[in-house]
Structure formats: structure tokens, C-alpha cells
Curated annotation (Swiss-Prot):
Transmembrane segments: none annotated. The lineage of its organism: Eukaryota, Metazoa, Chordata, Craniata, Vertebrata. The gene is CEP43. Required for anchoring microtubules to the centrosomes. Required for ciliation. Residues 225-236 have a biased composition (Acidic residues). InterPro entries: FOP_dimerisation-dom_N, LisH. This is Centrosomal protein 43. Residues 163-184 have a biased composition (Polar residues).
């Protein structure tokens, strides 16, 4: 019965499988599952090929560096640093990645190779720290004295018995300088000679030009000596005498320079010969000319007397040229008083200017013949 029961179960399983396959095929699920399985198989095969052909993880530059003695020494120092501080996880990554699981030297061998003597100061730290300290000491060596340049190796100049350095170097420098100067002087002798000739010719041209200039200046100075005489003559520096003093009509006291009165305020001189319009010409005989002039003088003196100017026939003509009047006696009066007198005189002149316009004239009277021999129009 057991066998029959097993056969019945097998038949039922087969029927169930067939029914399941048929159902999955009808629904399309079985075909999709087959396609996915097929794709997964292909992908697995392709990835397997890539993994087989993949290059190994090897750092070529690091491999070359570690093949040298210094490279292995550096790697040993780093490994010793990690071992000293018990950095096991970092060391577990460092050794496989650098392929230094074997062959790195220990602390004692490193100290011997680097020349480091194990002492109390070095035991308290890794060897890498001691290497850095020694490098810093070498850098500071020239200033601290270690590794500095030995100045005794440099040969100093010999010293005299008194302890002073001799000056043998300075003569050699002087000799070199003299040799250089001689060479330059020889090389520059030819251009200097040419330049000197050019300068001499140029100087001669300039000298001739200057001599011509000086001769021309002397000729010009000789051609116009009158101008120099006129400039140097003191006669032209003297002030022009005032009309009243020269003509003898009215004499006033000498005015100080800078006084308020000026020649512009003096009465105008008009129609100097208005009263002598009917006089005969000067080419007539002396008797006729003297008679007419005397008549005119008498007429002028009469008019002046009628105006009260104080000049009559009895006045001496010499006093007019000496510029003496009733104010000449006050020459020692102060400047302030003279200014006041000048102002008063100017006021009087303004009042009498209209009366003197027709009487202004210039007469030169001969004291011997009492006859005017020269007449001049002042206007």
C-alpha cells in the first residue's frame, strides 16, 4: 500500500506541475521569468570576464620608491611611528597597501642606520621626531655655532709685529687701478687729440667773433659821443628856471621840492606879443627899434603899476635876475610856513591870472643902452 500511495503522490505532483506550468504560460509569467533568468545569466558571465581581466591594485611610483634604500628607510620610520603609538588599525591598512608586510626594519636597526644613540631623550619619542630635531639643529647651526663656517680656514692678511694688518692688498689695488687708467688713457689718446684740435679751431673762431664785436662797439661809441656827453652833462640835470624869475614879472620865494605848488598851477602864458603887435620889425635901425621898445616898456610898466604888482620904472633890473622880493627875506622860515605862503600866492595868482594874460612877455634889456635888444614869444 505504501508503494501505491507513493505512486499516487507522484502522479499528483506531476499533474500539479503541469497544471502550474500551463497556468503560468497562459498568463505570460513563465515566459517573463525565463527571460529574466536568461538575462541574469548573461550578466553574470560578463561580470566574471571583467573580474578576471581586471588589473591588480599596485602603485608603481610607490613600488619604485620602496625599492630604494632611502624609500625603505622612510617607510620603516612611518611604520615605527605607528607602532610606537600603537596605531594597529592604521598599520593594518598601511602594510598591505604598501606591500611592506615583511622586510621593514625595526627600531634598533633604524637607530643604528641613522646614527641615533638611544638615550633618555630619544626613548620618550619616535625616531622620526629625533630626525626632525637634528634637521632643525643643522639649520640653526651657522647662527649657533654648529656647522658654521670656520673663519680660521680663511687666510687673513699678515699682521705686523704691532698686531695691525699690513696694507699689502691696497698697493695691488692701486697698481691695478693705475694699469686700468693707463690703458684707458692710451685708448682715449687719439680721440682726445682730435677733439682738442676741434676745440682749438672753435675757440679761434669765437675769439675772432668777439674781437669783431668789441671793435664794432667801439666804433659805435665813437660815432655818437654827443649822446654820452648829453647824458653825462650836469647842465641837463639842472631844473628849468621858473618863468616868473626869468621874465621879471613876479618873483616868488624858492620852493622846496615836494611842495604843494607846481608849475601846472601857474597862470598860463598867452599872447606874449599882443601888446607889441604894432611894433616895427627888428631889421629897422636901432634908433627906431629902441624908441618903440621904450614906449612899449613904459606902457607895460604903467599897466603893471595900475594893477599894483609893485614893478615900476625906478626898480632895478638886476634885482629881477637875483630873484629877490619881499618874500626872499623869509628864507629861514620853516617848511610849514612856506607851504602856507605858497598856497596864498597861488590864490592871488588865480585871481590876477586874467589880468596878466595880455601882459606876459619875455624881455632882455641892456643895462647900458636901456633898450630891449631881444624879444621872444613864450606862448
Amino acid at each position: 500500500m505504501a508503494a501505491t500511495a507513493a505512486a499516487v503522490v507522484a502522479e499528483e505532483d506531476t499533474e500539479l506541475r503541469d497544471l502550474l506550468v500551463q497556468t503560468l504560460e497562459n498568463s505570460g509569467v513563465l515566459n517573463r521569468i525565463k527571460a529574466e533568468l536568461r538575462a541574469a545569466v548573461f550578466l553574470a558571465l560578463e561580470e566574471q570576464e571583467k573580474v578576471e581581466n581586471k588589473t591588480p591594485l599596485v602603485n608603481e611610483s610607490l613600488k619604485k620608491f620602496l625599492n630604494t634604500k632611502d624609500g625603505r628607510l622612510v617607510a620603516s620610520l612611518v611604520a615605527e611611528f605607528l607602532q610606537f603609538f600603537n596605531l594597529d588599525f592604521t598599520l593594518a591598512v598601511f602594510q598591505p597597501e604598501t606591500s611592506t608586510l615583511q622586510g621593514l626594519e625595526g627600531r634598533e636597526n633604524l637607530a643604528r642606520d641613522l646614527g641615533i644613540i638611544e638615550a633618555e631623550g630619544t626613548v620618550g619619542g619616535p625616531l622620526l621626531l629625533e630626525v626632525i630635531r637634528r634637521c632643525q639643529q643643522k639649520e640653526k647651526g651657522p647662527t649657533t655655532g654648529e656647522g658654521a663656517l670656520d673663519l680660521s680656514d680663511v687666510h687673513p692678511p699678515p699682521k705686523s709685529p704691532e698686531g695691525k694688518t699690513s696694507a699689502q692688498t691696497t698697493p695691488s689695488k692701486k697698481a691695478n687701478n693705475e694699469a686700468n687708467q693707463s690703458d684707458t688713457s692710451v685708448s682715449l689718446s687719439e680721440p682726445k687729440s682730435k677733439s682738442s684740435l676741434h676745440l682749438l679751431s672753435h675757440e679761434t673762431k669765437i675769439g675772432s667773433f668777439l674781437s669783431n664785436k668789441t671793435l664794432d662797439g667801439k666804433d659805435k661809441a665813437g660815432l655818437c659821443p654827443d649822446e654820452d656827453d648829453m647824458e653825462g652833462d650836469s647842465f641837463f640835470d639842472d631844473p628849468i628856471p621858473k618863468p616868473e624869475k626869468t621874465y621879471g614879472l613876479r618873483s616868488e620865494p624858492r620852493k622846496q621840492p615836494g611842495s604843494l605848488a607846481s608849475l601846472s598851477d601857474a597862470p598860463p602864458l598867452k599872447s606874449g606879443l599882443s601888446s607889441l603887435a604894432g611894433a616895427p620889425s627888428l631889421k629897422d635901425s636901432e634908433s627906431k627899434r629902441g624908441n618903440t621898445v621904450l614906449k612899449d616898456l613904459k606902457l607895460i610898466s604903467g599897466k603893471i603899476g595900475s594893477l599894483g604888482l609893485g614893478t615900476g620904472e625906478d626898480d632895478d633890473y638886476v634885482d629881477d635876475f637875483n630873484s629877490t622880493s619881499h618874500r626872499s627875506e623869509k628864507s629861514e622860515i620853516s617848511i610849514g610856513e612856506e607851504i602856507e605862503e605858497d598856497l596864498s600866492v597861488e590864490i592871488d595868482d588865480i585871481n590876477t591870472s586874467d589880468k596878466l594874460d595880455d601882459l606876459t612877455q619875455d624881455l632882455t634889456v641892456s643895462q647900458l643902452s636901456d633898450v630891449a635888444d631881444y624879444l621872444e614869444d613864450v606862448a
